[in-house]
Regions:
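Carboxylate/His-rich catalytic cores and anion/metal-binding grooves
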Residues: 38-40, 90-136
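Surface-exposed loop/turn segments flanking beta-strands in extracellular/periplasmic regions
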Residues: 1-7, 56-70, 115-145
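Outer-membrane beta-barrel transmembrane strands
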Residues: 5-53, 73-94, 102, 114-116, ...
Length: 181
């Protein structure tokens, strides 16, 4: 499609407003100094986006009856994500320096939820009427009004141990399990 660039610059609209904040908190705590350490990590991700656009008939040069003229769009999505990671680290001090052990258990969680709504219409009565909620057409699959939510959750667990004898022989074992919905 070929559009009139002067009319696009003067009459078309395309606005995107996004706001995002990602705070993260981390706590390290020695339950038993240099032997047993707990770490707790949590991160929030809040992302909000608002889109508005309008394609006027004078920019397209197409007849007023086609669905590509006076096309208005308004969309909003709000996404929320919470991730956590909890670790318990065990590093005992042996009397003999020939032995060393590092073991940990870790639990990871994630929760994501998004709420969205959007509407796209065409053939508003005038190029001055740029809001899709006013009377206009929604006759094909592109032109629609939809809303909904999505949510996913996951959890993972790790159990790991590494034993060393004389810094020469290493034995490592790890088990991991995951689940989601």
């Amino acid at each position: 499609r070929i559009y009139n660039p002067v009319a696009m610059a003067a009459k078309a609209k395309y606005n995107v407003l996004g706001e995002r904040i990602v705070p993260r908190f981390l706590v390290d705590y020695f339950i038993v100094r240099n032997v047993l350490k707990a770490t707790f990590d949590i991160q929030f991700d809040i992302n909000n986006t608002k889109n508005k656009s309008f394609l006027p008939q004078i920019a397209t040069g197409r007849p007023n009856t086609e669905t590509v003229v006076n096309r208005a769009y308004d969309g909003d999505i709000d996404a929320f994500n919470v991730s956590t990671q909890s670790t318990l680290l065990y590093t005992p001090n042996f009397k003999s320096e020939k032995h060393s052990l590092v073991a940990f258990v870790k639990v990871l969680t994630n929760d994501y939820k998004a709420v969205f709504q959007e509407i796209m219409t065409s053939n508003t009565a005038s190029s001055l009427l740029i809001d899709p909620s006013i009377p206009s057409r929604t006759q094909n699959s592109e032109l629609r009004a939809v809303s909904g939510t999505t949510q996913t959750r996951s959890i993972g667990g790790i159990l790991s141990a590494q034993y060393s004898f004389k810094d020469k022989y290493l034995f490592n074992a790890m088990v991991r399990g995951d689940g989601n919905s």
